């Protein structure tokens, strides 16, 4: 069974990171492609531009953001194929750029994956 975790892309690489997937729409500032050491940049699972802009990483909006993002995930036609691909890996790290480790799309995506997988 695949193990999924969320991790900030600015954290140091770990030998046990597994398959590293950036789940942001935008490339994180100050991170080179070499430093990111990505296996995949999956913009398809990131929140829509409208939702991302509205949320603007405001913790006061997180609960509403979570609800809206979960709705986007439920309606995402590509997600089934993406999860099927990820489920072939031993470990998948969902990478995000924001500083807030508790209020971000990777946390919501991780929760969603754990419910549907």
Task: Give, region by region, the residue ranges found by the protein language model.
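Residues lining hydrophobic/aromatic ligand-binding pockets adjacent to catalytic sites
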Residues: 1-117
């Amino acid at each position: 069974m695949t193990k999924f975790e969320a991790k900030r892309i600015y954290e140091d690489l770990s030998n046990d990171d597994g398959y590293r997937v950036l789940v942001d729409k935008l490339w994180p500032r100050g991170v080179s492609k070499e430093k990111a050491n990505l296996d995949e940049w999956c913009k398809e699972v990131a929140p829509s531009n409208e939702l991302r802009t509205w949320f603007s990483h405001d913790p006061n909006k997180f609960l509403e953001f979570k609800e809206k993002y979960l709705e986007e995930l439920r309606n995402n036609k590509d997600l089934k194929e993406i999860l099927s691909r990820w489920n072939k890996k031993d470990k998948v790290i969902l990478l995000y750029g924001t500083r807030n480790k508790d209020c971000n799309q990777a946390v919501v995506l991780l929760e969603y994956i754990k419910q549907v997988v």
